[in-house]
Amino acid sequence: MSMLCYTLIIAFLIGIWAAPKSEDNVPLGSPATSDLSDTSCAQTHEGLKTSRNTDQRHPAPKKAEDQELGSAANIIVDPKLFQKRRFQSPRVLFSTQPPPLSRDEQSVEFLDNEDTLNRNIRAKRETHPVHNLGEYSVCDSISVWVANKTKAMDIKGKPVTVMVDVNLNNHVFKQYFFETKCRNPNPVPSGCRGIDSGHWNSYCTTTQTFVRALTMEGNQASWRFIRIDTACVCVISRKTENF
């Protein structure tokens, strides 16, 4: 009886193994797999064409960094221009960010152009701190960082073009100038503060000096001396006596 059962089981297993395989288990290279592969390839090719057309109609947006470099000056400055210390001035700064506080830790203003200087002076009148009680300045001055300075006078009195943005080693630096001006030509009704108005006429005026700045000469960058405002002084003259 047991031998008969074993024989039936073996015959049943042999029948299962001999049955034809379904299309789901067709080996690679069979017609079913080829059709599926062709369909997949066609869909992939169609997807690639669609993505290419989409990219052409809607190009990828440029990075902000690339846009910033594109808007900067096209002239690339040779780094060797900055290696000589005699060309450096404490009132000229090249930076990628607005300058911080001044060296004496006084608050200074940041200007985008020279036209806003008068507006900022009227809007924000910040006096220099008094170091000791009872000490006053003859003239009141204000110091500002000036950016976007495009025109200036050179040491020969000729107008020159000042470089605003400098492309150095694929980095865009802005050229800043630390300028000092008189806040008011007459800090007191009689003129300069502390001057005997009975014998002297006085008024405050802004004086200039020369600093080395990076300027444009044709299509090349070069160092030149230019005039900028650097101090506020008192000018006095003796009053004439009427006889």
Swiss-Prot record:
Pro-sequence residue ranges: 19-125
Biased composition (Basic and acidic residues): 47-66
Signal peptide: 1-18
Keyword list, A-Z: Cleavage on pair of basic residues, Disulfide bond, Glycoprotein, Growth factor, Lipid-binding, Metalloenzyme inhibitor, Metalloprotease inhibitor, Protease inhibitor, Secreted, Signal, Toxin
Disulphide bonds in the chain: C139-C204, C182-C232, C192-C234
UniProt subcellular location: Secreted
Region feature (Disordered): 47-69
A GO biological-process term: neuron projection morphogenesis
Sites carrying sugar chains: N148
Gene3D superfamilies xref list: Cystine-knot cytokines (2.10.90.10)
Database matches in InterPro entries: Cystine-knot_cytokine (IPR029034), Nerve_growth_factor-like (IPR020408), Nerve_growth_factor-rel (IPR002072), Nerve_growth_factor_bsu (IPR020425), Nerve_growth_factor_CS (IPR019846), Venom_nerve_growth_factor (IPR020433)
GO cellular component, one term: extracellular space
Domain of life where this protein originates: Eukaryota
Pfam families reported for this sequence: NGF
Summary of the tissues where the protein is detected: Expressed by the venom gland.
MF GO annotations: growth factor activity; lipid binding; metalloendopeptidase inhibitor activity; nerve growth factor receptor binding; toxin activity
Main localization of the protein described in the UniProt heading: secreted
Subunit structure: Homodimer; non-covalently linked.
Role: Nerve growth factor is important for the development and maintenance of the sympathetic and sensory nervous systems. It stimulates division and differentiation of sympathetic and embryonic sensory neurons as well as basal forebrain cholinergic neurons in the brain. Its relevance in the snake venom is not clear. However, it has been shown to inhibit metalloproteinase-dependent proteolysis of platelet glycoprotein Ib alpha, suggesting a metalloproteinase inhibition to prevent metalloprotease autodigestion and/or protection against prey proteases.
UniProt similarity note: Belongs to the NGF-beta family.
Protein name according to UniProt: Venom nerve growth factor 1
Upper classification of the organism: Eukaryota, Metazoa, Chordata, Craniata, Vertebrata
